[in-house]
Amino acid sequence: MSDTIRSGQCFCGAVRYRLHGAPMFVHCCHCRDCQKQTGGAFAVNGLIEGERVEVFQGEPQPIRMATESGYPHDIYRCTACQSPLWSDYGGRTWLRFLRLVTLDEPGAFAPDVHIYTRSKLPWVALPEGVRVFEEYYDVRKEWPAESQARYKAAKDKASASG
């Protein structure tokens, strides 16, 4: 695991954060929700433990969004410019879906998978050789063992603390 610290921020710079280490896994999500929420063709989300994202300036506010599943989806945005910085799903604040393009080095982490490609815009060309899923995927089959162990440790820690 990388102990590299990277910084990121919202569009206006009112919220700044540090990312401690690499994401467990990176999604390029082509679902309609991500398209509408970002105003783009897809969202690039790095899944990482909440405790590895350190906000050191400003404070993003969660905006609750409806989902098909019925589970809450909170998008954390800058209150000044409304840039989305990360999400959590189902109230799992211990797991962040960090918008990697908000990093000062947005190309630091390439997507591991492209998901919800059933709603991919027709003019988006996927790189040759990437793993592609029309919907979601089986984490146990796709995630590296180290990432699965990190996920389990974060989940267990969150469960133990209430």
Tell what function each PLM region has.
Residues 1-9, 14-162:
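A short Gly-Trp-Pro
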